[in-house]
């Protein structure tokens, strides 16, 4: 079984998937590059919300914490607990990475329901949550893949690759393909759930614009938070797995 060409083909497929389009899109032409403007705009808004809220809440830490400081301390403790549970005692260096993934995805998902993106008119397409676009979810999944390969190589050196022939060399092709398909599952799970949630809300609003969409929107907020938690948990679990060397 020729594994290396299969793995290369899988990576090429993941790269090609990043070009998949749903609906119309607005592009900026910068030099010789075509930039997906909608994703950049909404991502910048999400990043600005995160940075702004953190700066406002903790720019002047108090001995007796304010409500904002308490909130972000709770978030930090939550991310530390999640990282420690999945990675183990060496979780410390990975808290910023896992926390960034969780917070960006969480705020991105919620922005699709809470921010009035559609009042901003564009020449082509419309604004939506960044995670509503496959380009964003693939861009989040690829660094996760790099992170767990890096974690394993840093911990075990070239001995890291010994896991591919455990418990038996017969499983070598499956073990290799498993690692290269992890970013596919991460990106499609997040993209599919967020896109489906927004489509359901749009359809219900068009059919019954007053009452029915409200509970569906609350359910969407809940599932959006769960999707952020699932992504961060799986990312931490993959990193912990690569450092421990077991499946």
UniProtKB/Swiss-Prot annotation:
F-type ATPases have 2 components, CF(1) - the catalytic core - and CF(0) - the membrane proton channel. CF(1) has five subunits: alpha(3), beta(3), gamma(1), delta(1), epsilon(1). CF(0) has four main subunits: a, b, b' and c. The chain crosses the membrane at residues 38-58, 95-115, 133-153, 199-219, 220-240. The gene is atpI. Its main location: plastid. It comes from the Eukaryota. Belongs to the ATPase A chain family. This is ATP synthase subunit a, chloroplastic. It comes from Phalaenopsis aphrodite subsp. formosana. It is found in: Plastid, Chloroplast thylakoid membrane. Key component of the proton channel; it plays a direct role in the translocation of protons across the membrane.
